[in-house]
Amino acid sequence: MVLLGSLSRGEATAWSDIDIERWVESGTPALGTVPRFLDGRLLAISTNTVDDVFAQLELPDQALWAVPAYRAKRVLVDRGGDAAKMAAIVARFSWEALRPKADRFVSLTTAKSAEFVLKIRAAGERRDEWAALHAAGSLIGRCARIMSVARGTFITTENEYYRVVCEASGERWAGAFREAFALDGAYDAFAQADAACRLFAETARLVDDRLAAEARDVVRRTLALVHA
């Protein structure tokens, strides 16, 4: 059992929750726990199998979050020695070892994200604001994930996620990201959705050298349809 989050890092505020992760052996029922307040703080306990916990380190999009979290963890109980084993692994973790998997993730996720560009185009033709906003939100989130993996940007806390991805991706991408969230100017739903498409185009430009031929073709044809 380990303590994660701002309390383990020594950065807690009055609003920070108590984030506890319970590791169990494979096959053990993962019982959900309803959060509750403890001494004025929200207590959240999650349960994961040991196999699933260590598997995060083999998945690029999850390792970016897991490595900083487990480096800063505070061990509460470690009867089986798994927390000590994790500490040793994350201490010597190398992003370069995951680079091939990261490139495949970027290529596949970029190609799959093209679907939401087409959904935005369809929503615009129907003047369906809710469909446009849903597709835009989905596309924005995927673009951030693509760039975080493409740049190998470790995330210490959700509070800094967007900031560090924008810093790693450059001013042009960060500007497109802000526009997609309607931070720089007033937009209606369709203008915001169009801005999300521009963010996707900029994302695709930045990761073009990571795209497999099939993925690059999907992206190229999608953007050609949108701008036709």
Describe each model-derived feature in a short phrase:
Residues 1-49:
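Catalytic metal-binding acidic patch
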Residues 2, 86, 143-147:
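Conserved short hydrophobic patches within well-ordered secondary structure
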Residues 14-15, 57-58, 159-161:
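Short aromatic-enriched loop/helix-cap "lid" or pocket-rim segments at secondary-structure transitions
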Residues 33-34, 38-125:
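Conserved NTP/Mg2+-binding pocket subregion across the NTase superfamily
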Residues 95-228:
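Conserved nucleotidyltransferase catalytic core and NTase-mimicking acidic/glycine-rich helix/loop elements
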